[in-house]
Amino acid sequence: MSHSHGNASSVNDPRQPSAAKPYIPRPVAPEDLPVDYSGFIAVILGVSGVMFRYKICSWLAIIFCAQSLANMRNLENDLKQISMAMMFAIMGLVTNYLGPNRPATKK
């Protein structure tokens, strides 16, 4: 028994390759895009890093900024949010590492 892989199998192909069309995504308005959670988390962590002087929050804010930058969909709005989060994160790191030390808690 031999199987033929010639033109007969391509004619009987149930997938119909001649009817295939490339996928073209529909344009989505910037207001309808989903929320950029990593950018929002980066802003929150950056602000808490500056206000409460937590180094880990500032470092995590930089990581979330990088993630948000990699997944950026809307250039104008997302870039504003990422730049603000990055500014807070860098400001928190500068004040933590170069600023005056925190007063020690008395026991």
From Swiss-Prot:
The keyword Transmembrane helix applies. It is a single-pass membrane protein. Keywords: Membrane, Transmembrane, Transmembrane helix. One of its GO terms (biological process) is protein insertion into ER membrane. It comes from the Eukaryota. It holds the Pfam family ASTER. GO terms for molecular function: protein folding chaperone. Residues 1-15 have a biased composition (Polar residues). The chain crosses the membrane at residues 82-98. InterPro entries: ASTER. Residues 1-25 are annotated as: Disordered. One of its GO terms (cellular component) is endoplasmic reticulum membrane. It is found in: Membrane. Its main location: membrane. Belongs to the Asterix family. This is Protein Asterix.
